[in-house]
Amino acid sequence: MENLKKLAGIKAAEFVQSGMIVGLGTGSTAYYFVEEIGRRIKEEGLQITAVTTSSVTSKQAEGLGIPLKSIDDVDQVDVTVDGADEVDSAFNGIKGGGGALLMEKVVAVPTKHYIWVVDESKMVEKLGAFKLPVEVVQYGAEQLFRRFERAGYKPAFREKDDQRFVTDMQNFIIDLDLGVIENSVEFAQELDHVVGVVEHGLFNQMVDKVIVAGKSGLQVLEANK
């Protein structure tokens, strides 16, 4: 499967042309896309400017000699390629397994052509088996946790190295174990109105293409937005 992820990342890079501003995603599959962009710059003379979705991706891109800009210095991103943790039949997705959901969404919103690269295990009928990440400010996080608990969302603070995980934006992540999300659009709206929630991992009706790596090869699926 790792080789298929690599092939999917390389396939996604075909949508990148010189002169573009490119969003570089975060995660195991996006990693291969970033590597391929670095190779094309070095070997093919590809000329692009990139914005990144995490400190991890920034470090990778810098090591490959990919020119970077801040998202604040661009008005529009031509194409962004990123991974996803789940994608449903309506092309809504859950992202944030790597903890970069806020920056990923900030880059996705001004993107003209948004592409996800996933393996076939991520394609589901309905979202929710993967825990939904909710990024929250540190102040009042315990109160929010209890609120989610009362609602039956089975919350858990994300941890790393036996401590609470802190995002690049210095926030906590509460993962919600929802089982099935019957209406991801409505649930996203509910979370959008919770004070203290900075962002959540529901990416509804945002993606344009999904490149799926499976045992039989690669599929490029077009979202009907």
UniProtKB/Swiss-Prot annotation:
Q: List the active-site residues.
A: 104
Q: Which reaction does it catalyse?
A: aldehydo-D-ribose 5-phosphate = D-ribulose 5-phosphate
**Which residues does the annotation say bind substrate?**
26-29, 82-85, 95-98, 122
Q: Name one Pfam family in it.
A: Rib_5-P_isom_A
Q: Which HAMAP family match?
A: Rib_5P_isom_A
The entry's family comment says:
Belongs to the ribose 5-phosphate isomerase family.
Q: What is this protein called?
A: Ribose-5-phosphate isomerase A
